[in-house]
Design a protein with these regions (language model features):
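N-terminal Lys/Arg-rich, disordered targeting/topogenic segments
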Residues: 1-3
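Sec/Tat-exported extracytoplasmic proteins
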Residues: 74-82, 107, 127-131
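Short, surface-exposed glycine/acidic/tryptophan-bearing loops
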Residues: 86-104
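Catalytic cores and adjacent binding grooves of peptidoglycan-active enzymes
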Residues: 108-184
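Intrinsically disordered, low-complexity
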Residues: 5-84, 170-184
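Hydrophobic/anchoring residues in structured secondary elements
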Residues: 83-86, 138
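Solvent-exposed, acidic/flexible segments
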Residues: 56-67, 93-96, 110-118
Length: 184
């Protein structure tokens, strides 16, 4: 699976950059109105706090925006993940069209590896709307949004059966144009 291994420098840089908080002053639901001593109404925007998500451990080239968001959020949430595959040739549309990532699970065959994969899958479902989640495949089981999970046919290897990685497919949201901000 193509992906990028986590390097020491980006991890150290991220340790300083990820905690940075962007404060956005909005005009929507965050507005607060109050009357001053002269009876005039003053409107102040309440700050909305978002954490900017830096590029994660996966290669983003060719991924669509919601898939990038999922990749970055998973990279930020799970520092033990060191490889995420993205665009690659495949007979189905998901990877070639930038609609899916493969989150490689270290020591996938151990209880700790299974537990990590389960947490990654749960995180994807907790953020289903945000990520435009379509389905997750983990440990030979297909989990569609709004449908019943079912066991897949044996495809012959741990990799093909999705034991080595959690496959996360999104509806994409279109290709990035360079003006996107990815945030929690």
């Amino acid at each position: 699976m193509p992906g990028r291994r986590r390097r020491v420098f980006p991890v150290v840089a991220a340790a300083f950059a990820i905690p940075v908080v962007l404060v956005v002053t909005g005009v929507g639901d965050g507005r607060v109105a109050s009357a001053n001593s002269s009876g005039q109404t003053q409107i102040a925007a309440a700050p909305i706090t978002m954490r900017i998500l830096l590029p994660g451990v996966g290669l983003e080239r060719g991924l669509q925006v919601k898939t990038i968001l999922a990749e970055r959020a998973i990279s930020a949430r799970f520092p033990e993940i060191t490889e995420i595959g993205g665009v690659r040739p495949d007979g189905m549309k998901w990877h070639p069209e930038g609609l899916a990532i493969d989150v490689v699970i270290p020591d996938y065959s151990t209880p700790a590896g299974k537990e990590l994969g389960d947490r990654v899958m749960a995180f994807a479902f907790q953020n289903a709307d945000r990520f435009g989640l379509v389905n997750v495949i983990w440990q030979q089981t297909y989990h569609p949004i709004g449908g019943k999970a079912h066991r897949m046919a044996d495809l012959g290897s741990d990799d093909a059966n999705h034991y080595t990685h959690v496959h996360i497919a999104t509806n994409g949201g279109g290709y990035p144009n360079g003006t996107e901000t990815y945030a929690d």
